[in-house]
């Protein structure tokens, strides 16, 4: 596959974290406006926000978010960050993207939860107008927060369902807070008909993935731990659950150490629906184009297979049938070569 063609082909991204995907140059602008000190040297700034190829573990990887979050505590900063992610998506040939973020992590300077969501949606929509990339938002509850606080995020997702929030996610420490910790929260989301995509099996165990599906998730973020529990693969196939795989990130965090361990082919051969994502464009120093090129190198991925992975993403996207139909036509048209 040729990188320039892969970049041009319309792609769908469903697993992209706002706070992990802001260009260092944009972050510098955001920080300077708030008088937040940061390294003058571009390389030093990059080292602050880009994780090394091999982190000691997931927590080591996540330290890159600490500085970024200190900069994302104003409406202006959040709007600029969201706009920046859409401009990157446009350069990457992304036709549709779902950008996720945790509102509870942006309240340090007194922003109210609805103000936070409004700021991000404003940036996304401005980006859509300027660059032609369709986008929606997903709200994350942080697993370490109080249940009551997470329930507020579920209600928030419901309140903004007409203006660009299309789903709910749980992110954070999966080992200490497995899915059944949140049975009531997820029951509320199901009751309010909020689509669920949950982080599960990034670390921890395959049972977390099965439990997340049982609790209503139609998509799973990562799901890598399923490789060690093949008994759950049939459940995901039967329920037509989409696995949002993020290759670069999964190696960086130490979720897998070698290519032989990476379960991409195992999942495909088991008949599971898989899609490819960046996770964190800046922290993982990647693009969706780079992710597909990695698969081409590792598995000799073909254009037909890339198209199928893109269609898997579209099928699992939290969009209306009409919106999917238009994007489907765009994908089919682009692959006529």
Curated annotation (Swiss-Prot):
UniProt-annotated binding residues for Zn(2+): 15, 17, 199, 279
Keywords carried by this UniProt record: Hydrolase, Metal-binding, Nucleotide metabolism, Zinc
Described function: Catalyzes the hydrolytic deamination of adenosine and 2-deoxyadenosine.
Positions with a binding annotation for substrate: 17, 19, 172
Cofactor mode of binding and number, as noted: Binds 1 zinc ion per subunit.
Known catalytic reactions: adenosine + H2O + H(+) = inosine + NH4(+); 2'-deoxyadenosine + H2O + H(+) = 2'-deoxyinosine + NH4(+)
SUPFAM superfamilies: Metallo-dependent hydrolases
Name of protein: Adenosine deaminase
Top-level taxonomy: Bacteria, Bacillati, Bacillota, Bacilli, Lactobacillales
Organism: Enterococcus faecalis (strain ATCC 700802 / V583)
TM spans (from-to): none
Domain of life: Bacteria
Annotated GO MF terms: 2'-deoxyadenosine deaminase activity; adenosine deaminase activity; zinc ion binding
Gene Ontology CC terms, in alphabetical order: cytosol
EC code: 3.5.4.4
Enzyme class, UniProt record, top EC level: hydrolase
Similarity-based family: Belongs to the metallo-dependent hydrolases superfamily. Adenosine and AMP deaminases family. Adenosine deaminase subfamily.
Annotated GO biological process: adenosine catabolic process; hypoxanthine salvage; inosine biosynthetic process; nucleotide metabolic process; purine ribonucleoside monophosphate biosynthetic process
Gene designation: add
NCBIfam families, sorted: aden_deam
Active site: 202
């Amino acid at each position: 596959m040729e990188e320039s063609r892969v970049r041009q082909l319309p792609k769908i991204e469903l697993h992209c974290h706002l706070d992990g995907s802001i260009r260092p140059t944009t972050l510098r602008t955001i920080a300077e406006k708030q008088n937040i000190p940061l390294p003058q040297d571009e390389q030093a700034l990059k080292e602050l926000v880009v994780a090394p190829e091999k982190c000691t573990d997931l927590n080591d990887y996540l330290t890159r978010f600490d500085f970024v979050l200190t900069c994302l505590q104003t409406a202006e900063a959040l709007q600029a960050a969201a706009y920046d992610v859409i401009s990157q998506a446009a350069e990457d040939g992304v036709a549709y993207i779902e950008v996720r973020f945790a509102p509870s992590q942006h309240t340090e300077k007194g922003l109210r939860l609805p103000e936070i969501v409004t700021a991000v949606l404003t940036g996304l929509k401005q980006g859509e107008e300027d660059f032609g990339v369709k986008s929606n938002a997903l709200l994350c509850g942080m697993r370490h927060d109080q249940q009551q606080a997470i329930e507020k995020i579920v209600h928030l997702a419901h309140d903004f369902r007409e203006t660009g929030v299309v789903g709910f996610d749980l992110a954070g420490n999966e080992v200490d807070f497995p899915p059944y910790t949140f049975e009531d929260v997820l029951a509320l989301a199901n009751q309010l008909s909020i689509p669920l995509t949950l982080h599960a099996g990034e670390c921890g165990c395959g049972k977390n993935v099965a439990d997340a599906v049982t609790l209503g998730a139609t998509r799973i973020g990562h799901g890598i731990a399923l490789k060690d529990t093949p008994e759950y693969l049939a459940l995901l196939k039967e329920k037509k659950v989409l696995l949002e795989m993020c290759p670069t990130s999964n190696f960086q965090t130490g979720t897998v150490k070698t290519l032989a361990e990476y379960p991409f082919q195992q999942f495909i051969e088991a008949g599971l629906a898989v899609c490819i994502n960046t996770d964190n464009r800046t922290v993982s120093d990647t693009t969706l184009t780079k992710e597909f090129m990695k698969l081409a190198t590792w598995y000799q991925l073909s254009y037909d297979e890339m198209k199928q992975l893109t269609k898997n993403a579209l099928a699992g996207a939290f969009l209306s049938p009409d919106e999917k139909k238009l994007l489907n036509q765009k994908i089919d048209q682009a692959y006529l070569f």
